[in-house]
Regions:
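Helix-loop element at the rim of GNAT/NAT acetyltransferase active sites that forms part
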Residues: 18-31
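Conserved acyl-donor/pantetheine-binding loop and adjacent beta-alpha core of acyl/acetyltransferases
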Residues: 59-87
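A short beta-loop-alpha structural element at the N-terminal edge
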Residues: 2-16
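Glycine-rich phosphate/pyrophosphate-binding loop shared by adenosine-nucleotide-utilizing enzymes
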Residues: 3, 53-57, 83
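Conserved beta-hairpin
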Residues: 44-58, 62
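Conserved acetyl-CoA-binding loop-helix of GNAT-fold acetyltransferases
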Residues: 90, 96-109
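Residue-level recognition of the GNAT/N-acetyltransferase active site
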Residues: 86, 91, 124
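Conserved GNAT acetyl-CoA-binding A-motif
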Residues: 111-124
């Protein structure tokens, strides 16, 4: 089993849309334009690969994103530096194997390297 987390590419986006669709209602539906917009604005947009297949992704935004979310705006009004986790999705057939923890650990490592003091999110 070969597993790695790496920055997503534009070629990953269609598969990421399918994973996102499978995760509804835990996340909201996205179309191609919306995922492309997130891809361009995200500070952290990484995919989880298992045996040459994308099985998950995590998207985090920083301050200054053009993003129509009252939850994101709440953090932006209060903090100069933060990462806002927009969504984390793991393929249902691979949930419960610690992949979410791996993503959060990688995001914490990223935040530490960039000296970003807080990671925020909305909880459904």
């Amino acid at each position: 089993m070969f597993c790695k987390i790496q920055p997503s590419t534009e070629t990953d986006l269609l598969h990421i849309l399918e994973l996102n669709k499978a995760a509804i209602p835990a996340v909201n539906l996205l179309n191609e334009m919306e995922i492309q917009n997130l891809f361009l604005q995200a500070v952290y947009f990484h995919s989880l690969w298992l045996n040459q297949e994308v099985i998950g992704f995590l998207i985090a935004l920083g301050p200054g994103a053009i993003y129509n979310s009252p939850n994101y705006r709440w953090f932006e009004l209060r903090y100069d530096q933060f990462l806002y986790i927009d969504r984390i999705v793991i393929d249902p057939s691979h949930q419960g194997n610690g992949f979410g923890h791996m993503f959060y650990d990688k995001l914490k490592e990223f935040a530490g390297q960039k000296k970003i003091p807080r990671i925020t999110c909305e909880v459904n």
